[in-house]
Amino acid sequence: MQLNSTEISDLIKQRIEQFEVVSEARNEGTIVAVSDGIIRIHGLADVMQGEMIELPGNRFAIALNLERDSVGAVVMGPYATLAEGDKVKTTGRILEVPVGRGLLGRVVNTLGEPIDGKGPIDSDGFSPVEVIAPGVIERKSVDQPVQTGYKAVDSMIPIGRGQRELIIGDRQIGKTALAIDAIINQKDSGIKCVYVAVGQKASTIANVVRKLEEHGALANTIVVVATASEAAALQYLAPYSGCTMGEYFRDRGEDSLIVYDDLSKQAVAYRQISLLLKRPPGREAYPGDVFYLHSRLLERSSRVNAEYVEKFTKGEVKGQTGSLTALPIIETQAGDVSAFVPTNVISITDGQIFLETDLFNSGLRPAVNPGISVSRVGGAAQTKIIKKLSGGIRTALAQYRELAAFSQFASDLDDATRAQLEHGERVTELMKQKQYAPMSIADQSVSIFAAEKGYLKSVELNKIGDFEASLLSFMNSEHADLMKTINETGNYNADIEGELKASLDKFVETQTW
């Protein structure tokens, strides 16, 4: 069949008339640059801030920089096999991690994937890592204690459920030890724990997990790990993942405790990402939003009221408040608490436990400096008996520090000053405590009672530890009912005071230490 020129012309006109111009939004883009875990993508028509972008090989990146003609994203994991020209897709969702009771007793990475070799995790679903913190109306004031098991902390710097208490100090002076002991002390309290390790050596984390297991606390704990060798993106996101896992319990009317070890390394990872994304640097080369990095994380730790829990659980849980208590850790350089990140976190939290190198080196462990350590809201949550007995402890230690410095220059001291110095020395000695040996409320009460009522005056300084060990052994064997009552009620009245006094008088007569 032959077509003449007129027919061909008509056919072309017909085709042109039928042609429709359709604009189609693409959710696929092309990688145009890869370097240091950062990829630059062209062609993504519709992408959210923080959205997960699917990469070749079932990997993901997170969109952080949304620019006019490109998207800057940070790769979650290894990026060596990515190349310019690779196709990527948007997913329409932000990062989510598994949550639920199935995570308790497990060691997971930032994405909630198990890394302990114990098989898959039976989770209750997924939750986004970035959520808005509960509002003022949904919160309840802090009035229940979290016992760390440390005399120095529970007596002078009490922590309440829903509080944010910073642990700050130089490297290698017991910050992690304090936090781990606080977790170990929760094994029978019903408080679920989350330990987030950021930027640490894998061997150090393995040691922590082993210690938790040895002391029976791992079954009650979720360990979230982003080691020093992992991508900066995973180190930056690990605290948010851990927080989401802890919020699962808070929102269902339970109490949980989370340790961020440590936020200095998270800030460094975020600085690295920001500089690679060409964001303008500020003080100490940190980006302008490094305060918001920590504030939006720590504000999620709170005590929520019963209405919030009832609404969240759709009426399944009634009359229960929930809490998420945070113990963020910050590492200082040569005791400089006025650096950028330390001052930021101090201003966000409800108090700080300051550990000092000089105290640690002098043998005082935990090396808590009571002078600049403070708990802004924990006083309302403190156990009654500890609160009543420990009022003079902080004053005695603060005055002792002052007088000890002064006495180095004074040749002769009056009797009152000498008595104050001796009392301060004994209280300082009494505050020493071994690692992995948390004390019950009753044990702490007896020790503080002995110090406050003058029972240590006749004890030699180097025998204080032996005196305390013998006293607690005596009390737990001879006066078990009294100790049980104190542990269960936490009350302090004339009867309990009388019983404590009588039992200490009896013990002092034995001279068995």
From Swiss-Prot:
Its EC number is 7.1.2.2. ATP binds at residues 169-176. Keywords: ATP synthesis, ATP-binding, Cell inner membrane, Cell membrane, CF(1), Hydrogen ion transport, Ion transport, Membrane, Nucleotide-binding, Translocase, Transport. SUPFAM superfamilies: C-terminal domain of alpha and beta subunits of F1 ATP synthase, N-terminal domain of alpha and beta subunits of F1 ATP synthase, P-loop containing nucleoside triphosphate hydrolases. The record marks 373 as: Required for activity. The keyword Cell inner membrane applies. F-type ATPases have 2 components, CF(1) - the catalytic core - and CF(0) - the membrane proton channel. CF(1) has five subunits: alpha(3), beta(3), gamma(1), delta(1), epsilon(1). CF(0) has three main subunits: a(1), b(2) and c(9-12). The alpha and beta chains form an alternating ring which encloses part of the gamma chain. CF(1) is attached to CF(0) by a central stalk formed by the gamma and epsilon chains, while a peripheral stalk is formed by the delta and b chains. It is an enzyme of class 7 (translocase). One of its GO terms (molecular function) is proton-transporting ATP synthase activity, rotational mechanism. Its main location: membrane. It is a peripheral membrane protein. This is ATP synthase subunit alpha. Belongs to the ATPase alpha/beta chains family. It comes from the Bacteria. Transmembrane segments: none annotated. It comes from Shewanella piezotolerans (strain WP3 / JCM 13877). It catalyses: ATP + H2O + 4 H(+)(in) = ADP + phosphate + 5 H(+)(out). The gene is atpA. Produces ATP from ADP in the presence of a proton gradient across the membrane. The alpha chain is a regulatory subunit. It is found in: Cell inner membrane. InterPro entries: ATP_synth_asu-like_sf, ATP_synth_asu_C, ATP_synth_asu_C_sf, ATP_synth_F1_a_nt-bd_dom, ATP_synth_F1_asu, ATPase_a/bsu_AS, ATPase_F1/V1/A1_a/bsu_N, ATPase_F1/V1/A1_a/bsu_N_sf. CDD domains: ATP-synt_F1_alpha_C, ATP-synt_F1_alpha_N, F1-ATPase_alpha_CD. One of its GO terms (cellular component) is plasma membrane.
